[in-house]
Amino acid sequence: MLAPFDKSDWGAIAAAFESALKLPLGQAWSPEPEKKFRPGFVGVGWRDGIFWVRAVLDDDCLTTSATADNQNLWTLGDVFELFLRPMEGEVYYELHVAPSGHRLQLRFPDADMINRLREGKDRREDLLVDEPIFTFTTRTVPGGWEILAGVPAATFGWPAGDLSGRELLASFSRYDYSGDGSAPVLSSTSAHTIMNYHRQEDWKRLTLRA
């Protein structure tokens, strides 16, 4: 469990996550990182019935043209992504955060839905969640940006309160755009041997501790 922290105090946030599990972002699908790859890490923990995520991302050029929530943020510029699946079922969530303060929320009923989407058998619009199911804040720092995101127990169908012993699969990823029109640099905390963020067999199984 994380120590108490003030969500508006980035120094206190960093201190609370000091002893939390930290997951580095990488490019496991590539023998060597791309020249434009920039590092980052993600810390995770829980407190007050909320699963908390802190990301610290190096970035040479923050950019996004996002203007509203639930746009295809990964096509519009820099984005940080959370993939979360409580172990009680097959449902999982794909949550995006853009440096502009916009979000994308998708609820997948099962692991095969991504294949049905890519084959045109289902529509992304049917997966959108309009009401906020997580909170987040971002800040720009010299050489990058930071994200604090909180997913309440209710999003996972868990009772509020003590989350110790709860288990979920988790993966965190990003699209890092350079602003020069080139393709974004992708990275993930998961050891994806194939570049597919939805490969749940590569995600990290987390057990939340007291």
Regions found by a protein language model. Give the residues of each.
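Structural preference for beta-rich elements and adjacent junctions enriched in aromatics
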Residues: 1-210
